[in-house]
Amino acid sequence: MTTNDNMRALRFYQKRGFVLVAVHRDAVAAARALKPEIPLIGDDGIPIRDEIELEVLT
């Protein structure tokens, strides 16, 4: 699982055979309720909103 702004993580996992299996829209809002220090804006100025679920192909 990573957030929508984290292009480095998406590159890393996909190069190692992971595929996208789900996008949990607006999931970070719920996470911020528990951890308010999660920033609103992430890498490259991209708003942090969604969680992206990845799974490795076997």
Q: What is the role of each PLM region?
A:
Residues 1-9, 19, 25-33:
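Conserved beta-strand-loop-alpha-helix junction that forms the acyl-donor binding cleft
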Residues 12:
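Long, contiguous binding/interaction regions
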Residues 22-52:
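Conserved acyl-donor/pantetheine-binding loop and adjacent beta-alpha core of acyl/acetyltransferases
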Residues 53-57:
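Short, well-ordered beta-strand micro-motif
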